[in-house]
Amino acid sequence: MPVTVRRATKKDAARVAELSVALAEQHVGYDTARFARLITRDGAERFYGGQAEAPDAVVLVAERDGEVVGFAYMQYEPVLYAELAVKVACLHDIFVDKNERRSDIGKKLLETAADEARGFGATKVLLSVATQNDGAKAFFESVGFYTTMHEMMCLLD
């Protein structure tokens, strides 16, 4: 069945929360010193439910047969001083259910996110990807993203 991508509503928040917890756990698995286990399903449901109605953000869901199989969360920042950037859409989260990967769902989410970013007035999309996530890095590069920064961390005693 075909996949459709649309803006999320509060009714989607529970499933988006479930997927976001899986995304967070994936990151914690990469590096427990960098990624803290902070996200709860209830907290994520409240957060994404609220962001679905925020004027400067968009939560997208990908559906197949009426089931949400992926999501993306993006915020628009007209001026992002910390990144020395203007007119930026920050793609904070994008995740596809592990059983649905490699079926162009991620690409459809990104295409829709890019359209939404343009609608906000953005001229670029920024995202971060975990160093260990080779599949995601290759995917993002395949659709036109390129590396501009490297995050570094030093643990303090």
Question: Which residues make up each language-model segment?
Answer:
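Conserved GNAT-fold acetyl-CoA-binding loop/helix
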Residues: A24-F47
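Conserved acetyl-CoA binding element of GNAT-fold acetyltransferases
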Residues: A85-K98, H150-M153
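Conserved active-site alpha-helix within GNAT-family acetyltransferase domains
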Residues: K107, G119, T131-M149, C154
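Conserved GNAT acetyl-CoA-binding A-motif
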Residues: R118-S128
